[in-house]
């Protein structure tokens, strides 16, 4: 009886698809996820919400699938973490992307490591952000991520590591704001009582 009921909804959806009425299937998916919470129903429902610019519902559907341990693709983990971050939940965004990285579902590449770093940073978990900034920076062709890493070290009063990271960022180049990087380096040198280096850095601002 249960299978027939599910098949009834699937048949109805097939008919709507034939008639090119794709958005008409949305309420059917809403019923299916309640009674037959399979991964494809959640992800399809999330996609339909996205098409209708219902981002909060789009996130809710993906989050429900994640909480049931149904997600198994990188794009699903990154989409959910981006939506969570957009709706001001950086901690869960960081936990989701980190979970994907730890499971090997999400590849350890610059953009995913940078996302993990920025989500933890936004959640004010600087110790957790540090290793991700470091890994992302080492994969980047630009120095920007080393500057972010330096800012984190500076916030934690780790001045030697901050100096090393900022210097590496300036050396790698292609910074959006090189003057700001030199300003930060000057502040770090000042904290380290390296007066001449501090003055030299401030002059380069």
What is each model feature region?
Residues 1-204:
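Alpha-solenoid helical repeat scaffolds
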